[in-house]
Amino acid sequence: MTTLETPMDAASAAASGASATARFHTDKSPYDAVAGTPPERVSDLAREVLSAVHDTVRRHRVTYDEYNALKAWLISVGEDGEWPLFLDVWVEHVIEEVATDHREGNKGTIEGPYYVPNSPERGARGTIPMRDGEQGTPLVWNGTITSTDGTPLAGKVELWHADADGFYSQFAPNLPEWNLRGTFSAGPDGAFQITTIRPAPYQIPTDGACGKLIAAAGWHAWRPAHLHVKVSAPGHELLTAQLYFPGDPHNQDDIASAVKPELVLEPQVHPDGSQSVAYSFVLDPEKN
């Protein structure tokens, strides 16, 4: 398996940002979900965010040159189509933490900007769509879906992840549609088996506005290797998570701050070089 040693090429980063923004614009549900938010809450949130900005300006004595550079950078985030990337990398992990702190079942983490709904169905046991000769270590994943009381759930696991070079289909050129994206339906016993490849760690796109922030701040752009999942079952809360691999140096300093110890897998290595993993999901019933 190869890992990405350089940032995504410029065309891929630009296309990635444009695709993420376009897909978000086609989904009106975020606007509908908050349409009834009371003005008082909107005012409180806006005032507190602005107050935090004002406090930072005063504390660090921000200059006009820095202020104008900030304005130019904020404009470039929109021009580069990188608002989804910016928010998902640096903000979403706290939103997810607050939204799911009541759960008794599995803990989740961020969705990230590269989810695409309606991936191909593959049943309870199947192989994720991939190219002939797909590069990467073969990985077989066995698991179950149950409710918090232990009842098996015939739910679904939507799986998507990067390839062995760190690229996602639908967001990078020269990849087949739905490559390494699939939906698996657990059987009546809640069991599923998925065959895929182990993804690579990668850097988020660095040729746009987010990359300029990373360079100016002296940060790194790496995300550890991970599998994205959405796990659902009727009458239960949707679980969005990422599953990680042991030994990845960026499990400790993920640019997106999304790694949790309980989300790190324990793969078994077989004589032929392939790997297998067992990881199951416990879903919380929906609250009335």
What are the roles of these predicted feature ranges?
Residues 1-6:
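N-terminal acidic, proline/glycine-rich, low-complexity intrinsically disordered segments
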Residues 14-288:
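Beta-strand-dominated extracellular/periplasmic modules and repeats
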